[in-house]
């Protein structure tokens, strides 16, 4: 499963770990995703993976 928000499309960001000796290794910061039941229609609900910023901003309506 991809680490991508199904509402805004936000995905992981990539960067570097840098130690005190300045050794550099690649790393990634994942999105804070939560499985949420969302209202799709008047009677239908769907479970989607949504980032917490979309939940806080009210872009979805929970079922």
Swiss-Prot record:
One of its GO terms (cellular component) is ribosome. One of its GO terms (molecular function) is structural constituent of ribosome. GO terms for biological process: translation. InterPro entries: Bacterial_rp_bL28, Ribosomal_bL28, Ribosomal_bL28/bL31-like_sf, Ribosomal_bL28_bact-type, Ribosomal_bL28_sf. Keywords: Ribonucleoprotein, Ribosomal protein. HAMAP family: Ribosomal_bL28 (MF_00373). Belongs to the bacterial ribosomal protein bL28 family. This is Large ribosomal subunit protein bL28. It comes from Acidobacterium capsulatum (strain ATCC 51196 / DSM 11244 / BCRC 80197 / JCM 7670 / NBRC 15755 / NCIMB 13165 / 161). The gene is rpmB.
């Amino acid at each position: 499963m991809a680490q991508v928000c199904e509402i805004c499309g936000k995905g992981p960001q990539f960067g570097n770990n840098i130690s005190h000796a300045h050794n550099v290794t690649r790393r990634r910061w994942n999105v804070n995703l939560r499985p949420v039941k969302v209202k799709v229609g008047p009677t239908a609900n769907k479970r989607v993976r949504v980032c917490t910023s979309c939940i806080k901003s009210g872009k979805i309506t929970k079922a």
